C-alpha cells in the first residue's frame, strides 16, 4: 500500500489551524487544581541566519512530542516559539551576500536550498530576518508542531526589547551589572566582542590565563642612537608556574621573527567616573611578533625597538627569576610564535616532550643527556625522581614524532596534577600538592614582579563569522554581568541541586560551569537587538538577551493580540506582571492599557510559571542554559518561579558527517517534511538514538521507519470495519493484552522521562508480537483493533497526522474529536498476566531447544516427546523464588530445611546451579501450557507431540523447571 504522508499531514495541519486546537483560552482566575494541571515546556529558540536543519529537528521535536503527550494527559500545555536575531551574525551574513561572496552564495543556494532570485534580496539584516522567520514558521508548521503562534516574537521586536530593558534594569538594581575592563573574545574586523553565536570556528573556545614568568638576559641594543647593554625580559608562558623550579633550558624558534619592545602597563585612574589611562614603564621585552600584538590588546602599550630573527638569541643565557640559575636558549622549530610568547621553558624531568626534545638536541651536537642535568620538582607515587624519563623509556619513545609521546605527556601531567607533591627543590612551597599550588604561586610571583598574566584561547583557531581571526582583547569601559559574584553563584548552585535534569549526569556539568563562570561582557557597539538602557551607544549581546524570555512567552499573547505598543510597556508594568508590585489602576492610567489586560498578563504569568522543562542540545550547557539559571535566581525572590528542569540532547550527524551550515551537510527540516513526510521525520529523529547520545541520521534507516509506519497503517485499514466489542479470550489473546498493557507502563514512564527511543523500540516490538500472535493462531480481529487503537494513541504525540487519519478512519473523529485531544492510554492491571508471558517464553525456548537438537542430529522428527520436571524440582524452585536475593551458597541450607527434599540432597546442588543458569522465575503449569500449545507445535514441526508420555531414553530426569527434557524419534 502506498501512503502519502505529505498529503495526510497537509490535511490535518489545515484542520488543526482552522479549529485553533493548540490555543489555550485565557481566564480571569485559575483554580489551584488548574494550576497543578498546567505544563510549560520550551526549547532554546533558533537563530535565524539559515534554515532550520536536522539538529534543530531533534532538539525541537523532543519538547514537541512531550507537549502533545502532556496534552493527552489532560494538562493545559504552553508550548510556543520565538526567534533569535540579536547580535552580529545576521549583519555579517548580509554583508557577505551583498558582496556576493562565492562560498556564502554557494552554501545558501545549495545547502539551504534558497533560489538565487530570493538570495539576491537578502542583502540587508531586515530582509534576512523577515525571510528566515517565515521559513522557520513554515518548517515548524510543515512538521506539525502543536504551537501557540499567538505568543511568537523575534528578539528585535520593539515590544520584546522593552522586556529586555526591564530585565537589565532589575540586574543593575541588584548591582549585577558593572562597567570595567575585562579580557574578551574579540573580532578586530567587527570591532566587537564575540560570543558563541558569532563564531564560524572555535565556539567552544574559552579564555585561559597563562602565567608569564620573567626570565632576564643582557643584550646590546641601539636605542635613540646609543648602543649599549640593556637588561631585557624574555617572558615565558605556562599554565603550571610550579614547573619553573625544574627548568633546565628554554626553547626558541631560530626561524621566527622576534620583537624587542618597550612595554608600558596601562593603568586605569582610580577616580570615580574617570576613564583616564596612565602609562607605567615595564622594561624591555623580547617576544615573538605575534606575542607583541597580543600584549598591545591586553592592557599594555608596546613600542617597537628592533626586529630580530630567533637565531640571534640561540645560545644566550637567561636567568631564572626564582633561583637565579642560568638557563641556556636552545633552538627548536616546534616552538610556535603564535602560542604564548614564542619562547618556552623546558622541564625535561617532568615533561616527556621536553625530555625527548633535549635528548634529540644533545644527540645532534654529540652530547649525552645525563640525570645530573635533570631537575626534579615533584614527587609522585609509582615514579622515581624523573617521571618523564621513566615513561619515555618504558614506552619506547624514540623521537619527537612518536605518536606515543602525546599519551606519555597526558599520563604524567594527570598523575602530577592529582597526586603530585612539590619537593625540596621548590623551596618554601615544599610539601604542597600540585593541584593546590597554581593560584598561590601565581599571586606570589606577580607580587614579587617575577611574573605577569596573559590571556590565551583554549584552542588554536577562533574565527568570526565575518571571516576574521579573533583575538583576546581587554576591552575598557565595557559593561559586564558579574557572574563571578560568589553569593550569586551560591544561589545558582543551590537551585541546581534541586532541579530535575535529563540525563541526570549533566547536573555536575552545571555545577562545574557555575564554578568556572567569570564576569561576562553583555553589550557591544554593533549588532541587532536591544539598546543598553544605561548607555545607548551599546547593544545588549545575543547571549544576554536570551536568558529570561520564557517569562515573556506568558505575556506575549496579550501584547500581540491587543496591539499593545512598545511605549506602553514601561518598567512599572513589568514590575506588576512579574512581581505583583505597584498599583494596577495607576499603571493602567500611565500606560493606557486596560486593567483587564494587565490582570490577564499577571494571571497568565502566575498560572504558567515556573517553567517545567527547558530543552536544548548540549552545546548550550556552558552558556545559555547556565545563564538562564543565574538570571532566574537573581530576578525572582521566590523559588516557585525558578525553572524546574532541563533536558539536554546530543548532536546530530548526517551519515557520519558533522552538520555545517557553511560546508554541509545541512538537511533542512523542510526537505525531511517534503521527501519523507513529517511523521516519518519526527518518528525517526527521536527514536534513532538515546537522548544524551549523538544521533547519526541514516537515510536507509529513515526509509525503514517509514516502512514500519506504513505497515501499521495497513493493519489499521484492514481492521477499520471490525466491531470493537471483544468477546471470549484465548490464551494467546490474553498474552497479547498482557504485552500491550505491560508496554503501556514503560511507554508512560518513557514519555515522562524523555526516553523516546524506548517507545520506538516497543513499536518495533509490537510488529514482532503481532507476528507471534498470528503464528500462534491468534485471529481475534476485535482484539487486534483494540490493540491498534491503543497504539494509535501511543503514537499520536510522535506521528500525529497519521494517527489522526487512522482515528478518522475508525470513525472516532466526529464533531472534531481529534486524537490530539484524546486521553492517553494507561496501564490496566486487570490485563497483566505474568504467567501468560512466562508461558509463551517457555514455548519459544522449548521450540529453540527442539530445533537445536534437530540441527545437531540432522534428523527429520516423527514424534517429539516432551518431559516436564518432577514435582520436587518445582518445590526447590519455589524456595529459590522466595529467597531470590540470597547468595547461591545460602540456598542449600534453606532447601534442606524441607524434610521431603532432603532425600534428593545429592541432586540438589546441581539443580540449584542449573536453575540459576536458566533463570529463576515463578513456576508455571508447564504440562498444561504444552498441551494447550500441542496443535501449534505439531504444525510447526510437522510431527506428533507427546507431553509427559512414556519415558523413552530415560530423558525425563534431565528436565528442570522452565526447561523440558526432549526425546526425538
Curated annotation (Swiss-Prot):
Its EC number is 6.1.1.4. The keyword Ribonucleoprotein does not apply. Its main location: cytoplasm. Keywords: Aminoacyl-tRNA synthetase, ATP-binding, Cytoplasm, Ligase, Nucleotide-binding, Protein biosynthesis. A motif ('HIGH' region) lies at residues 46-56. GO terms for molecular function: aminoacyl-tRNA deacylase activity; ATP binding; leucine-tRNA ligase activity. It is an enzyme of class 6 (ligase). A motif ('KMSKS' region) lies at residues 658-662. InterPro entries: aa-tRNA-synth_I_CS, aa-tRNA-synth_Ia, Leu-tRNA-lgase_arc, Leu-tRNA-synth_Ia_arc/euk, M/V/L/I-tRNA-synth_anticd-bd, Rossmann-like_a/b/a_fold, tRNAsynth_Ia_anticodon-bd, Val/Leu/Ile-tRNA-synth_edit. GO terms for cellular component: cytoplasm. Pfam families: Anticodon_1, tRNA-synt_1. It catalyses: tRNA(Leu) + L-leucine + ATP = L-leucyl-tRNA(Leu) + AMP + diphosphate. PANTHER family: LEUCINE--TRNA LIGASE, CYTOPLASMIC (PTHR45794:SF1), LEUCYL-TRNA SYNTHETASE (PTHR45794). HAMAP family: Leu_tRNA_synth_A (MF_00049_A). Belongs to the class-I aminoacyl-tRNA synthetase family. NCBIfam families: leuS_arch, PRK12300.1. This is Leucine--tRNA ligase. It comes from Methanococcus aeolicus (strain ATCC BAA-1280 / DSM 17508 / OCM 812 / Nankai-3). The lineage of its organism: Archaea, Methanobacteriati, Methanobacteriota, Methanomada group, Methanococci. The gene is leuS.
Amino acid at each position: 500500500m502506498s501512503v502519502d504522508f505529505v498529503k495526510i499531514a497537509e490535511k490535518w495541519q489545515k484542520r488543526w489551524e482552522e479549529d485553533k486546537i493548540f490555543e489555550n483560552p485565557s481566564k480571569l482566575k485559575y483554580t489551584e487544581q488548574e494550576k497543578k494541571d498546567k505544563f510549560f515546556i520550551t526549547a532554546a529558540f533558533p537563530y535565524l541566519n539559515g534554515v532550520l536543519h536536522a539538529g534543530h529537528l531533534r532538539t525541537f521535536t523532543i519538547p514537541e512530542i512531550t507537549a502533545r503527550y502532556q496534552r493527552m494527559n489532560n494538562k493545559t500545555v504552553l508550548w510556543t516559539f520565538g526567534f533569535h536575531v540579536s547580535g552580529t551574525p545576521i549583519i555579517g551574513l548580509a554583508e557577505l551576500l551583498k558582496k556576493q561572496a562565492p562560498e556564502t552564495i554557494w552554501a545558501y543556494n545549495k545547502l539551504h536550498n534558497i533560489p538565487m532570485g530570493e538570495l539576491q534580496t537578502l542583502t540587508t539584516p531586515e530582509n534576512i530576518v523577515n525571510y528566515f522567520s517565515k521559513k522557520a514558521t513554515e518548517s515548524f508548521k510543515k512538521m506539525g508542531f502543536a504551537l501557540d503562534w499567538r505568543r511568537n516574537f523575534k528578539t528585535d521586536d520593539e515590544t520584546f526589547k522593552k522586556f529586555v530593558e526591564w530585565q537589565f534594569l532589575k540586574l543593575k538594581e541588584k548591582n549585577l551589572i558593572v562597567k570595567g575592563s575585562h579580557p574578551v573574545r574579540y573580532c578586530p574586523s567587527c570591532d566587537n566582542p564575540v560570543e558563541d553565536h558569532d563564531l564560524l570556528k572555535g565556539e567552544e573556545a574559552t579564555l585561559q590565563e597563562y602565567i608569564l614568568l620573567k626570565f632576564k638576559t643582557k643584550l646590546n641594543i641601539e636605542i635613540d642612537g646609543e648602543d649599549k647593554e640593556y637588561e631585557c625580559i624574555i617572558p615565558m608562558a605556562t599554565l603550571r608556574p610550579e614547573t619553573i623550579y625544574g627548568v633546565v633550558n628554554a626553547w626558541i624558534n631560530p626561524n621566527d621573527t622576534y620583537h624587542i619592545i618597550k612595554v608600558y602597563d596601562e593603568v586605569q585612574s582610580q577616580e570615580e567616573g574617570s576613564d583616564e589611562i596612565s602609562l607605567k614603564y615595564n622594561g624591555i621585552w623580547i617576544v615573538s611578533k605575534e606575542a607583541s600584538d597580543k600584549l598591545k590588546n591586553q592592557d599594555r602599550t608596546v613600542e617597537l625597538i628592533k626586529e630580530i630573527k630567533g637565531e640571534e638569541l640561540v645560545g644566550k643565557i637567561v636567568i631564572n627569576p626564582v633561583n637565579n640559575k642560568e638557563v641556556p636558549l636552545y633552538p627548536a622549530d616546534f616552538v610556535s610564535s603564535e602560542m604564548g610568547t614564542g619562547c618556552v621553558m623546558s622541564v625535561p624531568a617532568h615533561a616527556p616532550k621536553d625530555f625527548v626534545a633535549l635528548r634529540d638536541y644533545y644527540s645532534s651536537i654529540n652530547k649525552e643527556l645525563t640525570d645530573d642535568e635533570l631537575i626534579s620538582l615533584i614527587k609522585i607515587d609509582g615514579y622515581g625522581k624523573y617521571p618523564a624519563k621513566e615513561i619515555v623509556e618504558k614506552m619506547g619513545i624514540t623521537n619527537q614524532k612518536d605518536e606515543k609521546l602525546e599519551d606519555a605527556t597526558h599520563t604524567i601531567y594527570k598523575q602530577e596534577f592529582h597526586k603530585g607533591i612539590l619537593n625540596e627543590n621548590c623551596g618554601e612551597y615544599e610539601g604542597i600538592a600540585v593541584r593546590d599550588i597554581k593560584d598561590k604561586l601565581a599571586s606570589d610571583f606577580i607580587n614579587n614582579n617575577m611574573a605577569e598574566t596573559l590571556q590565551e584561547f583554549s584552542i588554536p583557531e577562533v574565527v568570526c563569522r565575518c571571516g576574521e581571526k579573533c583575538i583576546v582583547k581587554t576591552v575598557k569601559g565595557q559593561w559586564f554581568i558579574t557572574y563571578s559574584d560568589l553569593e550569586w553563584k551560591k544561589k545558582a548552585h543551590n537551585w541546581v541541586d534541586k532541579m530535575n535534569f535529563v540525563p541526570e549526569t549533566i547536573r555536575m556539568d552545571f555545577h562545574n560551569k557555575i564554578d568556572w563562570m567569570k564576569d561576562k561582557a553583555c553589550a557591544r557597539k554593533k549588532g541587532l537587538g536591544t539598546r543598553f538602557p544605561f548607555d545607548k551607544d551599546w547593544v545588549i549581546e545575543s547571549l544576554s538577551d536570551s536568558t529570561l524570555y520564557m517569562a515573556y512567552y506568558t505575556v506575549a499573547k496579550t501584547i500581540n493580540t491587543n496591539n499593545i505598543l512598545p511605549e506602553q510597556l514601561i518598567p512599572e508594568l513589568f514590575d506588576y506582571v512579574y512581581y505583583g508590585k505597584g498599583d494596577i489602576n495607576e499603571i493602567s492610567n500611565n500606560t493606557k492599557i486596560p486593567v483587564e489586560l494587565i490582570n490577564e498578563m499577571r494571571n497568565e504569568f502566575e498560572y504558567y510559571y515556573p517553567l517545567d522543562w527547558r530543552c536544548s542540545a548540549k552545546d548550550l550547557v556552558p552558556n545559555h542554559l547556565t545563564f538562564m539559571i543565574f538570571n532566574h535566581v537573581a530576578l525572582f525572590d521566590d523559588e516557585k518561579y525558578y525553572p524546574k528542569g532541563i533536558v539536554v540532547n546530543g548532536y546530530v550527524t548526517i551519515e557520519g558527517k558533522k552538520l555545517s551550515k557553511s560546508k554541509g551537510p545541512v538537511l533542512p527540516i523542510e526537505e525531511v517534511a517534503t521527501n519523507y513526510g513529517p511523521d516519518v521525520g519526527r518518528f525517526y529523529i527521536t527514536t534513532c538514538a538515546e537522548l544524551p547520545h549523538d544521533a547519526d541520521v541514516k537515510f536507509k534507516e529513515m526509509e525503514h521507519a517509514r516502512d514500519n509506519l506504513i505497515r501499521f497503517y495497513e493493519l489499521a485499514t484492514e481492521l477499520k470495519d471490525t466491531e470493537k466489542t471483544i468477546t471470549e479470550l484465548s490464551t494467546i489473546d490474553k498474552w497479547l493484552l498482557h504485552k500491550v498493557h505491560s508496554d503501556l507502563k514503560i511507554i508512560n514512564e518513557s514519555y515522562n522521562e524523555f526516553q523516546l527511543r524506548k517507545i520506538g523500540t516497543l513499536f518495533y516490538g509490537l510488529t514482532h508480537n503481532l507476528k507471534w500472535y498470528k503464528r500462534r493462531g491468534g485471529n481475534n480481529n476485535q482484539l487486534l483493533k483494540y490493540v491498534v487503537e491503543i497504539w494509535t494513541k501511543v503514537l499520536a504525540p510522535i506521528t500525529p497526522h497519521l494517527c489522526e487519519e487512522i482515528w478518522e478512519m475508525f470513525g472516532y473523529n466526529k464533531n472534531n474529536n481529534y486524537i490530539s485531544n484524546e486521553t492517553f492510554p494507561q496501564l490496566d492491571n486487570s490485563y497483566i498476566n505474568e504467567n501468560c508471558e512466562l508461558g509463551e517464553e517457555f514455548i519459544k525456548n522449548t521450540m529453540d531447544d527442539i530445533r537445536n537438537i534437530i540441527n545437531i542430529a540432522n534428523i527429520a522428527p516423527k514424534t517429539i516427546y516432551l518431559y516436564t520436571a518432577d514435582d520436587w524440582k518445582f518445590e526447590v524452585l519455589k524456595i529459590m523464588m522466595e529467597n531470590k536475593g540470597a547468595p547461591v551458597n545460602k540456598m542449600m541450607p534453606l532447601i534442606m530445611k524441607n524434610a521431603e527434599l532432603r532425600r534428593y540432597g545429592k541432586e540438589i546442588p546441581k539443580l540449584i546451579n542449573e536453575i540459576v543458569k536458566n533463570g529463576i522465575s515463578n513456576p508455571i503449569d508447564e504440562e498444561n501450557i504444552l498441551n494447550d500449545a500441542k496443535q501449534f507445535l505439531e504444525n510447526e514441526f510437522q510431527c506428533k507431540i507427546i507431553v509427559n508420555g512414556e519415558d523413552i531414553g530415560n530423558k525425563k530426569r534431565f528436565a528442570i523447571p522452565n526447561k523440558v527434557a526432549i526425546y526425538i524419534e
